[in-house]
Swiss-Prot record:
Belongs to the GatB/GatE family. GatB subfamily. GO terms for biological process: glutaminyl-tRNAGln biosynthesis via transamidation; translation. Heterotrimer of A, B and C subunits. PANTHER family: GLUTAMYL-TRNA GLN AMIDOTRANSFERASE SUBUNIT B MITOCHONDRIAL AND PROKARYOTIC PET112-RELATED, GLUTAMYL-TRNA(GLN) AMIDOTRANSFERASE SUBUNIT B, MITOCHONDRIAL. Keywords: ATP-binding, Ligase, Nucleotide-binding, Protein biosynthesis. It catalyses: L-glutamyl-tRNA(Gln) + L-glutamine + ATP + H2O = L-glutaminyl-tRNA(Gln) + L-glutamate + ADP + phosphate + H(+); L-aspartyl-tRNA(Asn) + L-glutamine + ATP + H2O = L-asparaginyl-tRNA(Asn) + L-glutamate + ADP + phosphate + 2 H(+). Its EC number is 6.3.5.-. HAMAP family: GatB. It comes from Halobacterium salinarum (strain ATCC 700922 / JCM 11081 / NRC-1). This is Aspartyl/glutamyl-tRNA(Asn/Gln) amidotransferase subunit B.
Length: 495
């Protein structure tokens, strides 16, 4: 590596094409069900989604409403009229030989989505968002896309409504991309148009170039000349927030190393290999002209202006976070955790309205989410247990068990063994110990630890904590720590 090459100060320019499957009962241009997760291959198909001659598409109104909701959420321009085009290319998962999509008149244009914290926020530009149909899915048998023995095609997915969201090249690091995707999917989930838990519901194509940092000086982002001069690599097969961060971190490093060695970066499409943690060259990158777009004659232009104002949107994550801060007194970091997923926010609000808001925030944001994250689960995976989480918080709020036992024993056992809170409390004898039993444990702790008693009288602060721990151990953690502390002080004053 030459000294001159090693001194180059390079910055990544990253833009995204995010494909999200919309939550509709039927496909975008036919009446086939989209509920295909457990279906046998090629059983949710019809002449329309198989592209048979003479089959005519009928636009799904629910998909259009979902797109309008997103447009409102990102403050995009929703034109009065939109239309569809055919994007022509050959691939086995596309039975018609073209994809019905939108080209020069997308349903949403010029929006933005804010990311970051309350003290450090910035807007990511969204150039456009348009509707299109999902292709079928490929199953590579005996290997990956590079070395499979053969590939099978399942057309159950063909025709599932997709929203493609195209950002401006506003990202400079892989971590920013992950943050944006988390925020975007949260907004879509709040809108009720996206199921984050559904396999394959999110797919990301990322375009990345490396340029000299000096070319990015000033405001307004990279100029058109800078973007034109930089060879752009597209990375496909990204299916999660985490994969996006890994893939772009790898690709940034790969391109940086090539440029610093004086090598050119090819304009190509690369495949993210999740198992190996690398991107692999697939083909030279297509240009827009390669797709030979022309209007879809079987779907007339769509007039959106007549009814777009009648489509409501619910409270979104940012507004809900701010309301949690003002209405419940929750800190910004905790409020962000609580509103990151709609199911989490709903659980917190239900508990906060019934019990103490601070207790509810601690339990949901720290205890429940922390335990689920440790198990690589989400609240959706245990959605049928909301009543049990509420009962556990009630036991703590009503002073029936200690917070320590609730977190360290009951919650973990609930998740490990699929048992109800009351059953665990009874079986493990975790009900709070009180009255004479606590007084006896206090007396025993004082009698058995004369050195700690002496240290307490000598002003050693840790001595009291030690004695509290001894009492808690004798009661199996079921005594109230505050009561134990008070009883110990009273008894030690007389010792």
């Amino acid at each position: 590596m030459s000294a001159q090459a090693a001194e180059r100060d390079l910055t990544a320019i990253i833009g995204l094409e995010v494909h999200v499957q919309l939550e509709t009962d039927t496909k975008i241009f036919c009446g086939c069900s989209t509920d295909t997760d457990d279906a046998d291959p090629n059983t949710h198909t019809c002449p329309v989604c198989l592209g048979l001659p003479g089959a005519l598409p009928t636009l799904n109104e629910g998909a259009v409403e979902a797109a309008v909701k997103l447009g409102k959420a990102i403050d995009a321009d929703i034109p009065e009229r939109t239309r569809f085009h055919r994007k022509n290319y050959f691939y086995p998962d596309l039975p018609k030989g073209f994809q019905i999509t939108q080209y020069d008149a997308p349903i949403c244009q010029d929006g933005e989505l804010e990311v970051g914290t309350a003290d450090d926020r910035r807007a990511i530009g969204i150039e456009r968002a348009h509707l299109e149909e999902d292709p079928g899915s490929l199953q590579h048998v005996g290997g990956s896309i590079e070395d499979a023995d053969y590939t099978l095609v399942d057309y159950n997915r063909a025709g599932t409504p997709l929203m493609e969201i195209v950002t401006r090249p506003d990202f400079r690091a892989a971590e920013e991309v992950r943050s944006f995707l988390a925020k975007l999917t949260s907004v879509l989930e709040y809108l009720g148009v996206f199921d984050a838990e559904r396999d394959g519901s999110l797919r990301v194509d990322a375009n990345i170039s490396m340029v000299d940092s000096a070319e990015l000086a000033g405001e307004g982002g990279p100029s058109d000349d800078v973007l034109e001069a930089a060879n752009r690599t597209e990375v496909k097969n990204i299916s999660s927030h985490r994969a996006a961060q890994k893939a772009l971190a790898y690709e940034t490093t790969r391109q940086r190393n090539q440029l610093e060695r004086g090598m050119a970066v090819a304009q190509e499409t690369r495949h993210w290999d999740e198992a190996r943690g690398v991107t692999v060259s697939m083909r030279s990158k297509e240009e827009e002209k390669d797709y030979r777009y022309f209007r879809e004659a079987d779907i007339p232009p769509l007039e959106v202006s007549d009814w777009k104002d009648e489509i409501p949107i619910p409270e979104l994550p940012d507004a809900r976070r701010e309301r949690f801060r003002t209405e419940y007194g929750v800190g910004d970091e905790t409020a962000s955790k609580l509103t990151s997923r709609k199911a989490v926010a709903d659980l917190f609000e239900e508990l906060a309205d019934e019990y103490d808001a601070a207790l509810a925030a601690t339990w949901v944001a720290d205890n429940v989410l922390g335990e689920l994250n440790y198990r690589d689960l989400s609240l959706d995976d245990v959605a049928d247990r909301d009543d049990e989480f509420e009962r556990l918080v009630e036991l703590v709020a009503e002073d029936e068990i200690t917070a320590k036992n609730a977190e360290e024993v009951v919650l973990r056992t609930m998740l490990d063994e699929d048992r109800a809170p009351d059953e665990i409390v009874d079986a493990e004898g975790l009900g709070k110990t009180s009255g004479d039993a606590v007084a006896d444990a206090v007396a025993e702790a004082i009698a058995e630890n004369p050195d700690a008693v002496a240290d307490y009288h000598d002003g050693e602060g840790d001595a009291l904590n030690f004695l509290v721990g001894q009492v808690m151990a004798k009661t199996g953690g079921s005594a109230d720590p505050g009561q134990v502390n008070e009883l110990l002080r009273d008894e030690l004053a007389q010792a």
